[in-house]
């Protein structure tokens, strides 16, 4: 089972307002989280320093290899302007994908995530904060 939790932060700084948010991806095995099941979680932070609300319709692509418990991320089309970061041993942050999907081959991360990984793929809708 995969769970997603959102955390948002709005603040004003020297360069104007900033709106960032973090998405926590959890893999839960052997029961529910309330039952103390084994859980592997990782946080990924998006941030946008421009004076814009996050109304983007882009999607974040998540690949989960349940056997090795590694989590792979790549931004999907429409998420330009956001930076993706993750820093855990079981996480591999993959490069941003171009909007033009025909150019994926030149973006190694997107190509690897689509073609070479034996993992389940999920998408998070950024504007609606949910799995799609």
Language-model regions, residue ranges each:
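Long, compositionally biased stretches
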Residues: 1-40, 56-85, 110-132
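Low-complexity, intrinsically disordered Gly/Pro/Thr-rich segments
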Residues: 100-114
């Amino acid at each position: 089972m995969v769970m997603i939790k959102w955390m948002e932060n709005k603040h004003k700084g020297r360069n104007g307002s900033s709106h960032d948010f973090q998405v926590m991806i959890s893999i839960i095995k052997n029961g529910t989280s309330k039952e103390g099941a084994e859980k592997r979680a990782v946080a990924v932070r998006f941030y946008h320093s421009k004076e814009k609300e996050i109304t983007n319709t882009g999607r974040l692509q998540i690949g989960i290899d349940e056997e090795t418990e590694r989590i792979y991320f790549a931004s999907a089309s429409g998420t330009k302007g956001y930076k993706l970061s993750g820093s855990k041993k079981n996480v591999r942050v993959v490069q941003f994908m171009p909007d033009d999907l025909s150019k994926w081959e030149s973006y190694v991360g997107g190509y690897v995530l689509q073609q070479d990984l034996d993992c389940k793929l999920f998408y998070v809708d950024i504007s609606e904060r949910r799995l799609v």
